[in-house]
Amino acid sequence: MQNSFDVIVVGGGHAGTEAAAAAARLGVRTLLLTQNLDTIGQMSCNPAIGGIGKGHLVKEVDALGGIMALAIDQAGIQFRTLNASKGPAVRATRAQADRSLYKRAVRRLLEDIPALQLFQGMVGDLLMEGDRLGGVILETGLVLRAAQVVLTTGTFLGGRVHMGDQNYPAGRAGDPPSNALAQRLREMAFPVARLKTGTPPRIDGRSIDYGVLEAQPGDAPPPAFSFMTRRIGVPQLACHITHTNARTHEIIQTNLHQSAMYGGHIQSVGPRYCPSIEDKVVRFADKASHQVFLEPEGLDTHEVYPNGISTSLPFGVQIELVRSMRGLENAVLLRPGYAIEYDYLDPRELHPSLESRRLPGLFCAGQINGTTGYEEAAAQGLLAGLNAARRARELAAWTPGRHEAYLGVMVDDLVTRGLDEPYRMFTSRAEYRLQLREDNADLRLTPHGRALGLVDDQRWTAFSAKQDAVQAERNRLEGLRIHPGSAIAGRIAAKTDQPLSRDVTALELLRRPDWDYASLLQVLDLVPCSDAQACEQLEIECKYAGYVARQHDEITRAARWEGTDIPADMDYAAVRGLSTEVMQRLARQRPQTIGLASRIPGVTPAAVSLLLIHVKRRGLRQAG
């Protein structure tokens, strides 16, 4: 094995696999290091991909040539569109995964990339050559060299598992933590803090009484994640729903002192939007019950994931609380639930490229940046891997803007605002979510991906064909003019109770709220275009055209100062009128642009105006 690479990625989870794939797609020599090759792409917690905000990220990763969407399409055993009754901007795809199929799909996709090499080993230290990053040192002493290193350590960095009053070092149950690297980062004065997350016990599905439970089937046909997938070929399964009850809550309340969290064994903050069952019972004491989704873990296993009861209670209490729920009276538990604490680095120490400000060449992605979720990790991994490869080629970093992608929103939030709890993506975090939809992720990002070298010929050809189909259908509908008094106008009046008063095109009708694409074509007696994705995109574009145009105007106005560079040597004390607090915040984070400065907590609009004036005056003085 060679020991010199352009990019080394540490960690084989969802961030690491995307980082390695992105870097290698650019053709640079890339090494993916993981402590166990058999766990590459492993789903450590829930067997699912997507959801509100998260599905948008998966589509964006796919639009940029990533692997997550392709892998879940090859492994998904139930697909659903969430918020299907709401507007397209907040609709999101979610899929249950067969864990084994997903892991195999990820491994296969990675092994198909020529410039990527996999290796099993635990990183114990960063190789420093003076004050420059030179690679990594494995715990075996093996030295691997690269000027660019991407850390995607997940929950392994100083990880410690908790169950009741018992705890032990682990990256997840059954896998050792990365303690030597965690200690090294602390010694190097990186800003390290602790977060926690958790997972529920697993149940033997043969011990569940499904006959008394509500079934939750997937959509038919299943909605694929990848823009490259035309059909889901994996057999589909239903999930089931049960609920906690008064007895469940009594068991939890009685044993709360034994919980690792409430017993004082864990001080770290967990994810607000994925609380443990103990948290739910305490924080929402007025609720009589909570939903629990029983999710199959695969086609060839009886193991079931009870989504909604993450816990750090002792195992005996876990058995009792599970068996208190309808349909689970005789449940057999296969694995205990637990909480896990781990180290993360303050993401405000990163550039928007996800490169460290403290140590050039070091990139971070995933839970090491304080985020939670496979999808958030994958999106960061792709960006970090891309920019590590671009740095290796001495090219400028690339990061999408907040108006271009949820990835841009997330990274901007992380590097400007930081966090005090695990960060999860929601559509509500985006100012311009009307144009950040799942359906147009390819339109927004695939041209960027092509220019950056992430998108191959096959994907580019498919994207171009789809856009040609959208334009052809737009032209067809725009060219179909309907006259008042015609037979078609009569059918339209019969449907809407409103006769036409002037000539209209079919495209104008599609823009109206009382028409959808299918019913319009039925009235006009037209066959739909052959590309279903193209039909959907055209319809949504028509419906949102006015709103998107207004948002585009907002973006254009903001862009006048958003991208204005702030000199790296800016003396904030010289900016007249800034408060001491604002001055200190700006000096600590040293934002690269006015836009980034405007989103730092505590930096007021008035302060932004003063800063903008100062930067412009400084530029004029230097020019003169």
From Swiss-Prot:
GO biological process: tRNA methylation; tRNA wobble uridine modification
GO CC annotations, alphabetized: cytosol
InterPro entries per UniProt: FAD/NAD-bd_sf, GIDA_C_N, MnmG, MnmG-rel, MnmG-rel_CS, MnmG_C, MnmG_C_subdom, MnmG_C_subdom_sf
PROSITE patterns in alphabetical order: GIDA_1, GIDA_2
Superkingdom of origin: Bacteria
Predominant place of localization: cytoplasm
Pfam families given in the database record: GIDA, GIDA_C_1st, SAM_GIDA_C
Keyword DNA damage carried by entry: no
Binding sites annotated in the UniProt record for NAD(+): 270-284
Gene Ontology MF, one: flavin adenine dinucleotide binding
Record-linked SMART domains: GIDA_assoc_3 (SM01228)
Cofactor(s) recorded in Swiss-Prot or TrEMBL: FAD
Binding site for FAD: G11, G12, G13, H14, A15, G16, V123, S178, Q367
Keywords: Cytoplasm, FAD, Flavoprotein, NAD, tRNA processing
Subcellular location: Cytoplasm
Family membership: Belongs to the MnmG family.
Function noted in UniProt: NAD-binding protein involved in the addition of a carboxymethylaminomethyl (cmnm) group at the wobble position (U34) of certain tRNAs, forming tRNA-cmnm(5)s(2)U34.
Subunit structure: Homodimer. Heterotetramer of two MnmE and two MnmG subunits.
Protein name per Swiss-Prot or TrEMBL: tRNA uridine 5-carboxymethylaminomethyl modification enzyme MnmG
Natural source organism: Acidithiobacillus ferrooxidans (strain ATCC 23270 / DSM 14882 / CIP 104768 / NCIMB 8455)
Gene (UniProt): mnmG
